[in-house]
Swiss-Prot record:
ATP binds at residues 45-52. It comes from Pseudomonas putida (strain ATCC 47054 / DSM 6125 / CFBP 8728 / NCIMB 11950 / KT2440). The keyword Transport applies. Pfam families: ABC_tran. GO terms for molecular function: ABC-type nickel transporter activity; ATP binding; ATP hydrolysis activity; nickel cation binding. This is Nickel import ATP-binding protein NikE. The keyword Ubl conjugation does not apply. The gene is nikE. It is an enzyme of class 7 (translocase).
Length: 273
């Protein structure tokens, strides 16, 4: 049985207002998708393709207008009480906006431990040990736990944001453009750390991005969204080639995953840039 099953899901939003005619905007239509435990898939598409809306449906933040999202065989929209609490512990979302995920008046350590206070029975000592271990796992130091969000760089804050998502040992983590504001080297470092976690613990990942190079670096399978529909799905291989025009456009715009050396005017290699 798949860990996550999206069955013929559609979603729409109200449009219009006081001075405009009301109507509906269909943002997702006929989405079918499965994810297995320990798998990493990429949701690839340009802005407005429906990626972030699908992420919200996967985590039960919104109920689909049509179809069903099931996690471990249970309809996500029907979970209540202890079942809902268990689901919140099992599935985590990381947004692009790291500053918005933290209370500016609370320390980084306090924020990372927040899911542990609400979703687990850990005592204070265990929470502190888990927080420090997560910081180290994400390439941060123990002293960062005492700092306020505004005292960290953007890259450090996003790593702390991911550490917070991993705190309660979820089975699934959805990264919604979570690496978009980071430089390429830091993106790769974080993905290497998450890949090690995936292999070690069997955590599944959904990487939502418009950057094909990151999807190719991290994911086992790629799903291409366009106009609210899945238009192509392929395993990630070194010779990945899309048939759909949107996929080919994204492929043409791809940046190299690693910095490339270029020849100097004298034909000698120069340092990577």
């Amino acid at each position: 049985m798949s860990l996550l099953h999206v069955h013929h899901v559609g979603h729409r939003y109200r449009t219009g207002g006081l001075l405009r005619k009301r109507g509906w905007l269909q943002v997702l239509d006929g989405i079918d998708l499965q994810l297995h435990a320990g798998e990493s898939i990429g949701l690839l598409g340009s802005s407005g393709s429906g990626k972030s809306t699908l992420a919200r449906l996967l985590l039960g933040l919104e109920k689909p207008a049509q179809g069903q999202v099931s996690f471990a065989g249970q309809d996500v929209s029907q979970l209540k009480g202890e079942q809902a609490r268990a689901f919140q512990r099992t599935v985590q979302l990381v947004f692009q906006d790291a500053p918005g995920a933290f209370n500016p008046q609370r320390s980084i350590g306090w924020s990372i431990a927040e899911p542990l206070r609400h979703l687990t029975d850990m005592d204070e000592a265990a929470r502190q040990a888990r927080t420090l271990a997560l910081l180290e796992e994400m390439g941060l130091r123990a002293e960062h736990a005492q700092r306020l969000p505004q005292q960290l760089s953007g890259g450090q804050l996003q790593r702390a944001n991911i550490a917070r998502a991993l705190a309660a040992s979820p089975q699934l983590v959805v990264l919604d453009e979570a690496l978009s504001n980071l430089d390429r080297l830091l993106q790769l470092q974080i993905l290497q750390q998450l890949e090690a976690l995936r292999q070690r613990s069997g955590t599944a990942f959904v990487l939502i991005s418009h950057d094909l190079s990151l999807v190719q670096y991290f994911c086992q399978r790629v799903v291409l969204l366009h106009g609210g529909r899945i238009v192509e799905e392929r395993p990630v291989t070194h010779d990945l080639c899309f048939a759909h025009p949107v996929g080919r456009q994204l492929q043409a715009a791809v940046l190299p995953v690693r910095p490339q050396r270029r020849p100097s005017p004298q034909g000698l290699p120069t340092a990577a840039h």
